[in-house]
């Protein structure tokens, strides 16, 4: 009920043309701008979470492939080979999804790059370089233990970078929430203190 009354009074003030009307519209425009920024940040967070989830799944399969490869190096035989290939096939199936998720994340981050440092942008470019390396390089020699280990380390670094960026995006979102709350409070006080 309070919110509805406040909205009605806000509209009355804006239509009356008193000095507070201009101030109210400026604050409302600032709030709308912040809400748009928050929307862009949330889209980037969602996209980053998707990429992070795929990276974690790839890491699980690479860890398993690494273990089977170690067992194979110690004479594990046909069962170790089959298990290793199975895990590497699962990784290969996920790589294209991961590459697409990284591209999507990069696209979403482009909408908020003016708020993110230049160094971070370079790291985002490295994501795609990593994905291209992984997609092109791993499976030409995928029985080699070192390739599995190297790919695992690259996936882990990329996952860590995604997590770091997600932390920065969450910090930005929290900062925008505080600014928006302050503006909403300013708007409310302007309306309540108006004589209209």
Describe the function of each predicted region:
Residues 25-111:
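Domain-scale macromolecular recognition modules
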Residues 1-62, 148-196:
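Long, non-membrane, amphipathic alpha-helices that form coiled-coils
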Residues 64-94, 107-196:
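Long amphipathic all-alpha helical oligomerization modules
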């Amino acid at each position: 009920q309070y919110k509805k009354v406040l909205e009605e009074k806000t509209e009355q003030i804006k239509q009356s043309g008193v000095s507070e009307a201009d101030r109210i519209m400026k604050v409302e425009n600032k709030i709308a701008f912040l809400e748009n920024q928050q929307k862009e940040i949330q889209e980037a967070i969602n996209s980053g979470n998707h990429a992070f989830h795929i990276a974690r799944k790839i890491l699980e399969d690479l860890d398993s492939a690494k273990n089977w490869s170690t067992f194979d190096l110690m004479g594990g035989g046909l069962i170790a080979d089959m298990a290793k290939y199975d895990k590497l096939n699962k990784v290969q199936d996920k790589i294209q999804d991961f590459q697409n998720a990284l591209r999507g994340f990069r696209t979403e981050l482009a909408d908020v790059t003016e708020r993110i440092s230049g160094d971070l942008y370079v790291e985002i470019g490295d994501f795609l370089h990593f994905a291209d390396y992984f997609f092109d390089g791993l499976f030409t020699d995928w029985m080699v233990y070192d390739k599995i280990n190297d790919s695992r380390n690259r996936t882990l670094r990329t996952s860590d970078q995604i997590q770091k960026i997600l932390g920065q995006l969450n910090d930005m979102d929290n900062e925008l929430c505080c600014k928006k709350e302050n503006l909403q409070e300013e708007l409310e006080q302007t309306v309540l203190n108006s004589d209209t």
